[in-house]
Amino acid sequence: FLSAIASMLGKFL
């Protein structure tokens, strides 16, 4: 779950 959020954040940034 956390990894998914980090991945989404990285993609957004």
Curated annotation (Swiss-Prot):
One of its GO terms (biological process) is defense response to bacterium. Its main location: secreted. Expressed by the skin glands. It is found in: Secreted. The keyword Secreted applies. Antibacterial activity against Gram-positive bacterium S.aureus (MIC=200 uM). Shows no detectable hemolytic activity towards human erythrocytes. This is Ranatuerin-7. It comes from Aquarana catesbeiana. The lineage of its organism: Eukaryota, Metazoa, Chordata, Craniata, Vertebrata.
